């Protein structure tokens, strides 16, 4: 599946949000790249909406075609479309692995999933976009549990808070999905209503 593989810090600076998490280069220069990066640009309504969509796409590592499908699904579901969209994005397996603290970044989580390190309800899943459901159980495979990424995750457990809709159990780092998240449990710096307005045109 296609994905963005360019310089993430540059993209973070362009969108004004840390897409990596703990990106020191972004923290030093949180303004757009280029000689005149600090210059103020008059924001049109469309530009603001488009930028918010791009922030969401690059935060979760989703290409445009797939992101639009997510929006269309969110729009069909009951409730607020923006809340539904974020819930869909949060339920991706790569994001759940990241949220559970088993990877430092979503990009790293995507790689771990793609390399086949996880099972969901006892079945191997190597598709990062796989959507988890309430009561799913995600395990690290036996042959992977003592590899370096998971040893590091055990050593750094607790450095980043785990959201209340997930639980990580024991040394084997089993992830329990107690529920899908409510909007208040999703801490991404997005104004999802701007995305809804963009696609509603």
From Swiss-Prot:
* GO cellular component labels: small ribosomal subunit
Query: What GO molecular function annotations does the UniProt record carry, in alphabetical order?
Result: rRNA binding; structural constituent of ribosome
Q: Which Gene3D superfamilies match?
A: Ribosomal Protein S4 Delta 41, Chain A, domain 1 (1.10.1050.10), RNA-binding S4 domain (3.10.290.10)
Assigned keywords, A-Z? Ribonucleoprotein, Ribosomal protein, RNA-binding, rRNA-binding
- Which GO biological process entries does UniProt record here? ribosomal small subunit biogenesis; translation
Keyword RNA-binding in record: yes
Q: Which SMART domains match?
A: Ribosomal_S4, S4
Q: List the disulfide bonds.
A: none
Which InterPro entries does the annotation name? Ribosomal_uS4 (IPR022801), Ribosomal_uS4_bac-type (IPR005709), Ribosomal_uS4_CS (IPR018079), Ribosomal_uS4_N (IPR001912), S4_RNA-bd (IPR002942), S4_RNA-bd_sf (IPR036986)
According to its UniProt entry, the function of this protein is described as:
One of the primary rRNA binding proteins, it binds directly to 16S rRNA where it nucleates assembly of the body of the 30S subunit. With S5 and S12 plays an important role in translational accuracy.
Under the subunit heading, UniProt states: Part of the 30S ribosomal subunit. Contacts protein S5. The interaction surface between S4 and S5 is involved in control of translational fidelity.
Protein family: Belongs to the universal ribosomal protein uS4 family.
Protein name in UniProt:
Small ribosomal subunit protein uS4
Species of provenance = Mycolicibacterium vanbaalenii (strain DSM 7251 / JCM 13017 / BCRC 16820 / KCTC 9966 / NRRL B-24157 / PYR-1)
At the highest ranks, the source species' classification is: Bacteria, Bacillati, Actinomycetota, Actinomycetes, Mycobacteriales
């Amino acid at each position: 599946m296609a994905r963005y593989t360019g310089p993430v810090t540059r993209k973070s600076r362009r969108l004004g949000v840390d897409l990596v998490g703990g990106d020191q280069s972004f923290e030093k220069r949180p303004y757009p790249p280029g000689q005149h990066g600090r210059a103020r640009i008059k924001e049109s309504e469309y530009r603001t909406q488009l930028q918010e969509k791009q922030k969401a796409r690059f935060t979760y590592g989703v290409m445009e075609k797939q992101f639009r499908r997510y929006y269309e699904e969110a729009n069909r579901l009951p409730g607020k479309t923006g809340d539904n969209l974020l819930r869909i994005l949060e339920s991706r397996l790569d994001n759940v692995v990241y949220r559970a603290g088993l990877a430092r970044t979503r990009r790293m989580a995507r790689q771990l999933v793609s390399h086949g390190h996880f099972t969901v309800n006892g079945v191997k899943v190597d598709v990062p976009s796989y959507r988890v459901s309430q009561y799913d159980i995600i395990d690290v495979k036996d042959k992977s549990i003592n590899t370096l990424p998971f040893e590091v995750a055990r050593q750094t457990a607790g450095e980043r808070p785990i959201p209340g809709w997930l639980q990580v159990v024991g040394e084997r780092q089993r992830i329990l999905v107690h529920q899908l998240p409510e909007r208040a449990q999703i801490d991404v710096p997005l104004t999802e209503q701007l995305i809804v307005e963009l696609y509603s045109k």
